[in-house]
Amino acid sequence: YNHLPPICEKLGIKEPEFYLEMNPMPNAHTSGDTRVFIVVTSGLVEMMDDEELDAILAHECGHILCRHVVYNMVANYLKMGLDALGILGSVAKPVEYALLYWSRKAELSCDRCGSIITSPEVVARSMARLAGGPKSITNKINMQEWALQADNYDQIKNDGLWNKTLQFAATIGLTHPFSAVRVREILKWGESPQYKNLMQNLKAEASGKKCPKCNKRTWCKKVLKK
């Protein structure tokens, strides 16, 4: 539990209810409407080290920060409404596929929250742990090579109509992107000016630096360069 409050404070969100599910399968999820809560399984806690657990909790907090829980609830109600009205086929399925596409993009946003609290490398490591199991195996994974699989996948899926069709069929029902894609995207973002500037700004904010002009805690570039 002690991992959660500092993460919520850094992200500027109200601390949600937090539950431990006795389940050997490693997993975490965020849910609720008026009372938002995070659930982690005992299998996840046993598998992850402290940094990896922080990355996963920050990912779940990202769903709260970005209001994914509310949007997902509205989307599910919309889908249930279409089903209840008997609206199928040409209307309901495109709506469902659009929601799943949004869900995959939302996961990438939350991976960024995890990297802000820890680092892109820790986020990638936590994904390796979830995908491959114990440290004796996952510590040997070359993250750059794993991310390269996503590039190879992109080349294949863009090579002709048939491959595009296969890719569409393979991903259309997924709520999460493929792990290799998530690793590539978070490592790529970790090299971006946006991420580096953001981390500089957060570091300056945490140190209490103030702008010499307005005497306020700020993300002023002049202050950050000192």
Outline where the language-model segments fall:
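Short helix/loop segments within enzyme catalytic domains
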Residues: 1, 7-13, 88-156
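Post-HEXXH active-site segment of zinc metalloproteases
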Residues: 68-97
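Short cysteine-rich clusters marking metal-coordination/redox-active sites
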Residues: 211-214, 226
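Conserved short-loop catalytic and cofactor-binding motifs
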Residues: 41, 98, 170
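Charged, alpha-helix-enriched surfaces in structured cytosolic catalytic cores
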Residues: 48-52, 56, 69-73, 86, ...
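Peri-catalytic and regulatory segments of divalent metal-dependent proteins
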Residues: 1-71
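Pan-zinc metallopeptidase signature
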Residues: 131-132, 136-212
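Short functional micro-motifs and their immediate structural scaffolds
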Residues: 216-221
